[in-house]
Amino acid sequence: MKKVRFIFLALLFFLASPEGAMASDGTWQGKQYLKEDGSQAANEWVFDTHYQSWFYIKADANYAENEWLKQGDDYFYLKSGGYMAKSEWVEDKGAFYYLDQDGKMKRNAWVGTSYVGATGAKVIEDWVYDSQYDAWFYIKADGQHAEKEWLQIKGKDYYFKSGGYLLTSQWINQAYVNASGAKVQQGWLFDKQYQSWFYIKENGNYADKEWIFENGHYYYLKSGGYMAANEWIWDKESWFYLKFDGKMAEKEWVYDSHSQAWYYFKSGGYMTANEWIWDKESWFYLKSDGKIAEKEWVYDSHSQAWYYFKSGGYMTANEWIWDKESWFYLKSDGKIAEKEWVYDSHSQAWYYFKSGGYMAKNETVDGYQLGSDGKWLGGKTTNENAAYYQVVPVTANVYDSDGEKLSYISQGSVVWLDKDRKSDDKRLAITISGLSGYMKTEDLQALDASKDFIPYYESDGHRFYHYVAQNASIPVASHLSDMEVGKKYYSADGLHFDGFKLENPFLFKDLTEATNYSAEELDKVFSLLNINNSLLENKGATFKEAEEHYHINALYLLAHSALESNWGRSKIAKDKNNFFGITAYDTTPYLSAKTFDDVDKGILGATKWIKENYIDRGRTFLGNKASGMNVEYASDPYWGEKIASVMMKINEKLGGKD
């Protein structure tokens, strides 16, 4: 009985749908339909062979029109006139629906390049996930899926392939889309397939053959966008090295296992070549190929001297080296001792090094006999009859009677023996540039006044000159009536002479007083003195700015910079914008000299340094080795005199206002 009932219900459903309904040759009376047997159709489908369409006759015997009909899980749509919609789109309440060839509304399905959702409505401007294809699609405003194009959706860019599939975790030209399909914006990306990092720029494309600055470091992206790592890059006429993490090597050492050598990379990442580097409390030299000099000799054309670099590249200084079956000595500045005497405090003996730096032995040099070990056999360097001595080391200190340092003087300077004070085997009482003190005998070499040059002063009738070397003189004052033209005068302080006292107009001038010259007048100095190619030219305004800000005389600043930098034309001036010799130590002037960013900063920065280290400490005038700036600023005992001479020369050219 149950089986018969089930078959009956199924038959009723079948007959209630278009598939189960049968064609009829009945007639229409308005919206009603009379079947062939004359009965009135109701609650059933009718196929009219004349109109070739299905109609649905409702319970009130009228056909359904402009409305939906649900039968089971299916929906049908009856159009105006009662025709059943099939294989077509129907618009209802602003939405579109698709009825298939059987008239059923499609749901969760593709219709061409359109998609209808769970309600049957066509999807518009929304995402669609199709589990059959395991892919995402996007339906645009026109109801069609995106295809072979980029779309920006809610601020993110997506790419859709042929067929509308969303591209994920792949490259598309120079762009990359992540696992969610969004185009990767600015930042790093690691691609496992290529086992490399890439950098995506702000425009969404990967960086290619270019530098990127990120989080305080530079990186280089090669052709194809691959990040350079553990490799060299040639760019901007220099080599650069990208470390294992891709960061550019900068201000650091790098060991290259391929060449088995160390290299140094400066600020900006440039490989150092033909250059010195101060690091680890030592000097190192990087050769023309960038490799560190190690266990070898290097000739530096700038200083015109040989240097030796030990294992690890450390510069040898104050040390002996055995090489080429001879001993060599590297001085405190690292230069090879050559054609000179060297006192070794360890063995407490003098040695002589010939041309090429070879140590002399078993021979006589300048009348002094050297033994088989190279030591001088002649005993003392002093001479009881000598009145003058010359400084032997690069610099040597002058001490008071208690052994406290008073000042220091440069190699080659000539000191007077002060016979009014006691000297002994270890120290000599001397006088130089106004300073009286004591110097170690080992730092001095006796001079023969009848043969050796002794500094002197002389007047030509117009100017009074200080001859500090045989071919070098400094005009220090105007001729005085008490002076005898052509006569050589000698003075231990440069002020007191036989028959007169010299008044140097600028040597003891208070440098905290402003000059009477304007910036424009200071600029004229270069043309008046015929000085060309100077970095200091037209910098009068900067000198005056320094004067106003730091209260230091601008004329002095110009003269000081002129002396130290050869009027802004020296190598240190050109390479480092250092015009005042700041930290240009006697042993390593170029290497140790401070670097300034530009000319103006070189002038202003040095003025600030001078104020803090000299003016503010009471040394407000140039002076000599007894007082003033010259005591500590320079080892040259006549440094102050030389600057004062330049000031005098400029003052005369500009009209004598100071």
UniProtKB/Swiss-Prot annotation:
Its EC number is 3.2.1.96. Cell wall-binding repeats lie at residues 42-63, 65-84, 86-105, 124-145, 147-166, 185-206, 208-227, 229-248, 250-271, 273-292, 294-315, 317-336, 338-359. The keyword Repeat applies. Its main location: secreted. One of its GO terms (biological process) is cell wall organization. Plays an important role in cell wall degradation and cell separation. PANTHER family: PEPTIDOGLYCAN HYDROLASE FLGJ. Belongs to the glycosyl hydrolase 73 family. This is Putative endo-beta-N-acetylglucosaminidase. It comes from Streptococcus pneumoniae serotype 4 (strain ATCC BAA-334 / TIGR4). The gene is lytB.
